[in-house]
Amino acid sequence: MHKAGFVNIVGNPNVGKSTLMNQLVGERISIATFKAQTTRHRIMGIVNTDDMQIVFSDTPGVLKPNYKMQEYMLAFSESALADADILLYVTDVVEDPEKNADFLEKVRTMTIPVILVINKIDASNQKTVGQLVEKWHALLPNAEILPISAANKFGVDMLLKRIQELLPDSPPYFDKDQLTDKPAKFFVSEIIREKILLYYDKEIPYSVEVRVEQFKESAKQIHINAVIYVERESQKGIIIGHQGMALKKVSTEARKTLEKFFDKKVYLETFVKVDKDWRSSQKELSSFGYNPE
């Protein structure tokens, strides 16, 4: 009998959901940085064996939205509650267990298997982790609780084994050679945005979106033109930097990562444009792929 199912990863910002997703899939599907709200979309990563298919979904961190883009991000997270066969609720050793009580209540009332993953235990001690397990058991009495360190791969194999045990009997949902539901252009824009998150401070990374205007692939190389959108002229100047040096650094680092990702020579051109309404315009957000169902 073949097993298959949707395993959706939810939780608050910056608890390590994307790192865990990448470890479970065994590939770099989601960008992961030390900054909150790195993930903006719902991203699927697919694990296949002869008799099993696990469709993991990484989701944006749960937050109270301040503008339309964040409303869409929350909708991605809430949609993950609706179509999961197994839910992974990820927290860490410093998070307040009662943060975002409304979302947590939705998790508590779910009838599917829920695994509460306490991440980053390498940054704590056995006593503190034990106390957290007790607190979480009181909040989510029906959930299985598994402490892990995704960054160090501690406990990840045990988590994967438990997921395999809980998977329902089902034919595969995707072709067995498919790794994700996202096209190549999506990963290009995400990798460029990752470098912006790493190299710029304050509001700049959160005011930026990337659109790939051209993606031409041949047997040995890829030519990419990408536009970085910001909200204000002042942000455009910061992104470009003195004599274009800041943008050149981001583009160089993005190109290196893209060459590893695609295993090909990459030629990357980046441009910066101002679109002051992109975070609040439904039309603009839709063009950037913010289409929660």
Predicted segments with their positions:
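Conserved G1/Walker A P-loop phosphate-binding module
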Residues: 1-75, 79-81
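Conserved glycine(s) of the Walker
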Residues: 16, 155, 246
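Conserved C-terminal guanine-recognition region of P-loop GTPase G domains, centered on the G4
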Residues: 75-143, 216-218
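Canonical P-loop GTPase G-domain recognition
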Residues: 113, 122-180
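P-loop NTP-binding site
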Residues: 184-293
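Active-site phosphate-binding and catalytic loops of NTP-dependent enzymes
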Residues: 30-32, 99, 171-175, 198-209
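Catalytic P-loop NTPase motifs of RecA-like helicase/translocase cores
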Residues: 39, 62-64, 96-97, 124-125, ...
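Active-site glycine-centered loops adjacent to acidic/histidine catalytic or metal-binding residues
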Residues: 58, 119, 149
